[in-house]
From Swiss-Prot:
This is Putative 4-diphosphocytidyl-2-C-methyl-D-erythritol kinase. Catalyzes the phosphorylation of the position 2 hydroxy group of 4-diphosphocytidyl-2C-methyl-D-erythritol. The keyword Manganese does not apply. GO terms for molecular function: 4-(cytidine 5'-diphospho)-2-C-methyl-D-erythritol kinase activity; ATP binding. GO terms for biological process: terpenoid biosynthetic process. Pfam families: GHMP_kinases_C, GHMP_kinases_N. It catalyses: 4-CDP-2-C-methyl-D-erythritol + ATP = 4-CDP-2-C-methyl-D-erythritol 2-phosphate + ADP + H(+).
């Protein structure tokens, strides 16, 4: 039996530069992790089946689940003769912009690597994971990083300054592909990647908060205005900075003082079912 944790990610920045020939967008984003985790357990099977056990019936346990697909890919890649049972204890909200599925897939690749004593490097696992999800390479490492290309090119950055994170997911789900289809690259939107990069380099918390920016945010807000209301609520309640993560709908706020963080948590707790008070990891 092997255990792995799969932490959620948040975007400090997210920019799309151009549409690639392969249909994907060229992206440039800075991400980090927070201490909201899914927990996964892996058991070898006597047959060759892949079985995903998960309590929530709204999360698929078949090939639509990224952890299942990661296991399938790993077993094919290393020509394994045994299957695996994957038990997932989910804490990360689903379809939230927090890369919960990608985190589970990355944890599966790391877990099976240990379970079957394959000895693959993290670089090899990241390359393998990139075949099924653009956030998976980042989730293999779980470090603060600048991700470019489709998300597979990773430059590790300094850990962010210590801070509380208030995560709040409105009662809706958003499909990333649907949001990416609506990107208008002719429309100017300033994403402060360079400022964020320098803020992390200098461990400058105030500059980090000022740099938070996400090109997808206005697109998701145009379809779901409650995202913007939630963000403004956090800022009015004392957040040093706030942003929608990924394609949304989760919004997070940053705070350095615990009392400040609890005030923000209480302010948004009434309007969302899923609100979490966590810490930056990076």
């Amino acid at each position: 039996m092997i255990y792995e944790t799969a932490p959620a990610k948040i975007n400090f920045t997210l920019d799309t530069l151009f549409k690639r020939n392969d249909g994907y967008h060229e992206i440039e984003m800075i991400m980090t992790t927070v201490d909201l985790n899914d927990r996964l357990t892996f058991h070898k099977r006597k047959d060759r089946k892949i079985v995903v056990e998960i309590e929530h019936n709204y999360v698929p346990s078949n090939h639509k689940n990224l952890a299942y697909r990661a296991a399938q890919l790993f077993i094919e890649q290393y020509q394994l003769k045994q299957g695996v049972t994957i038990s997932i204890d989910k804490e990360i909200p689903v379809s939230a912009g927090l890369a919960g599925g990608s985190a589970d897939a990355a944890a599966t690749l790391r877990g099976l690597n240990r379970l079957f004593n394959i000895g693959a490097s993290l670089e090899e696992l990241a390359l393998l994971g990139s075949k099924i999800g653009t956030d998976i390479p980042f989730c293999i490492y779980n470090k603060t990083a600048l991700c470019t290309g489709k998300g597979e090119k990773i430059e590790f950055l300094n850990k962010p300054p210590s801070a509380w994170v208030i995560l709040a997911k409105p009662n809706l789900g958003i499909s990333s592909p649907d949001i990416f289809k609506l990107i208008n690259l002719d429309k100017r939107y300033d994403v402060h990647t360079k400022m964020c990069y320098e803020a992390l380099e200098n461990r400058d918390y105030q500059q980090l908060c000022q740099s938070l920016s996400n090109r997808l945010e206005p697109i998701s807000v145009s379809k779901h205005p409650q995202i913007d209301k939630l963000k403004n609520n956090m800022l009015k309640s004392g957040a040093d900075g706030a942003l929608m993560s990924g394609s949304g709908p989760t919004v997070y706020g940053l705070a350095q003082k615990e009392s400040q963080a609890k005030n923000i948590y209480n302010a948004v707790n009434g309007c969302c079912n899923e609100v979490y008070l966590v810490r930056l990891l990076g």
